Regions:
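Short, acidic, small-residue-rich periplasmic hinge/interaction motif at the N-terminus
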Residues: 35, 41-90, 120-125, 135-187, ...
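Short strand-turn segments of transmembrane beta-barrel domains in outer membranes
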Residues: 246-250, 258-268, 277-308, 320-337
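Periplasmic N-terminal accessory/gating domains of Gram-negative outer-membrane beta-barrel systems
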Residues: 125, 131-143, 157-267, 278-284
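Extracellular loop and loop/strand-boundary signature of outer-membrane beta-barrel proteins
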Residues: 290-292, 330-334, 378-385, 394-398, ...
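Outer-membrane beta-barrel translocator domains and adjoining extracellular loop/strand segments
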Residues: 330-335, 363, 368-377, 413-416, ...
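Short, acidic Ser/Thr/Gly-rich low-complexity loop/linker segments typical of extracellular
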Residues: 92-104
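Transmembrane beta-barrel wall of Gram-negative outer-membrane proteins
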Residues: 298-324, 334-367, 386-415
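N-terminal export/assembly leaders
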Residues: 1-59, 95-98
């Protein structure tokens, strides 16, 4: 017998077909072909029904921009990778995974936006990295440190916490705060400079024209700058020209700088030669899976960056960034600020010998001011001309070797160079007097 719903089947429409030596399945398939109806056989009955067609909305047809989030989960004290830790996106817990034998994880097809990423593992406190920006232009790499969780057998309490006061340096107990480049980029009028961001903290006073900061009333020139654990000269363009301890623009581009520590109080014993505060900055590692390049043009300069793997199998990578000022192009004359800077980092992890890295930072600053026309002289400054030349270099070779779960050795061989030269002339009606 044949069963159907009369309201959904046009019984007035007739079909004439001829079959010979065919099965009932082939006959019904030919009969209902392109009619919008389907059938199914139950026992001795054939049931005919209207085909269920699901309409796709326009929003589902729209292809969303997605990107990949990669990273590593490590122990905050020993920096050793944590295997098989669970990683997920808090806004969508279904998107996530677990780390491999080297602590690496990968989450694919994440729509662009900002996300909070959580890592959890037995014996550790859940760790959350907040406000991770995902863009379509490049992969996101996140390092998630986790603290061991001491458990009482009578009671177990696991509580996720977002610790803004946790520093990159595990030896810092108090007086420090981690500054992420994400925070610096969102700070109004901050020029992506961690020093300008720090002026918003308690006990820190900033300057409008420079990135000089006075910490707890101490002079800005007593602030110590560190890069990859090595003390370096102030990595700021035109430093100390308008005021001691400050400069115009950070020489470290947002393309290369990673999470850094800022100390405005008591700091660990490893930081010496500092009376005010400490900026302990770090260069991030390049992408060891794919090549990525960036080109930025702004009012202050041109920024070129490139990163990618050196050897994918061994996990080695490179990262390089170069900036060149465009103020001379914008002004069209010789009274301007000219600067260049170059930063790079090469990372070479090994299975038995530890991790080797080579890094460097260099900056060149030039500033020339010509004297005004004689008819425009009103003050001593109008009669003056000057030329400033600043060159700074810093670089090193670093090695990190993990002895066991609680101990690792980090050693560095580095060199720094700094040279400042200033010339000033005073023009009179009869002569030019060199005053500096």
């Amino acid at each position: 017998s044949i069963a159907y719903e009369q309201s959904k089947l046009d019984i007035e429409k007739k079909h004439s077909l001829s079959f010979k030596n065919v099965t009932i399945d082939k006959a019904m398939a030919q009969l209902l072909k392109e009619t919008g109806y389907v059938y199914k056989i139950k026992g001795y009955h054939i049931i005919i029904s209207l085909q269920d067609i699901k309409q796709k909305t326009t929003s589902n047809d729209t292809q969303k921009l997605t990107q990949t989030i990669r990273g590593i989960v490590v122990d905050s004290k020993t920096n050793t990778p944590i295997e098989y830790a669970s990683v997920c996106i808090i806004e969508d817990p279904s998107r996530g995974g677990s780390t491999d034998g080297r602590g690496n994880f990968r989450i694919n097809n994440i729509p662009v936006g900002r996300y909070n990423i959580q890592a959890s593992f037995m014996g550790y406190r859940p760790s959350i990295i907040s406000e991770v920006s995902v863009t379509s232009s490049k992969e996101v790499f996140v390092e998630i440190p986790m603290d061991e969780n001491v458990q009482d057998l009578a009671e177990v309490l696991v509580k996720p916490e977002i610790k803004k006061d946790r520093t990159v340096n595990p030896m810092a107990i108090t007086g420090g705060r981690m500054i992420s480049i994400e925070e610096a980029s969102r700070f109004a009028n901050g020029f992506d400079d961690p020093a300008r961001l720090s002026s918003a903290f308690a006990g820190v006073a900033g300057d409008v024209g420079t990135n000089a900061v006075a910490i707890r009333g101490n002079a800005p020139q007593f602030t110590q700058w560190r890069l990859e654990g090595i003390e370096i000269p102030n990595p700021t363009h035109f430093a100390d020209l308008s005021g001691l301890g400050g400069g115009f623009l950070s020489a470290l581009s947002t393309q290369v700088i990673g999470n850094s520590d800022f100390y405005n109080g008591a700091f660990p014993a490893e930081y010496s030669n500092a009376l005010s505060g400490v900026f302990d900055m770090h260069l991030r590692n390049g992408n060891n899976q794919k090549y990525e390049h960036a080109f930025q043009v702004g009012l202050m300069g041109i920024d070129l960056a490139s990163e990618g793997p050196i050897n994918k199998k061994r996990g080695s990578s490179y990262l390089i960034n170069y900036r060149f000022s465009t103020t001379s192009l914008a002004s069209g004359n010789d009274i301007n600020l000219k600067y260049q800077d170059l930063a790079f980092k090469l990372n070479f992890p090994t299975r038995k010998a530890g991790t080797f890295s080579i890094w460097g930072l260099g900056l060149i600053d030039r500033n020339k001011a010509d004297v005004l026309e004689r008819s425009e002289w009103e003050t001593m400054g109008d009669r003056s001309s000057g030329y400033n030349k600043l060159d700074k270099l810093a670089g090193g070779l670093a090695h990190k070797y993990v002895l066991d779960e609680n101990t690792y050795i980090r050693s560095s061989l580095s060199a720094t160079y700094s040279k400042d030269r200033s010339l000033a002339d005073l023009h009179t009606d009869d002569a030019i007097i060199n005053v500096a």
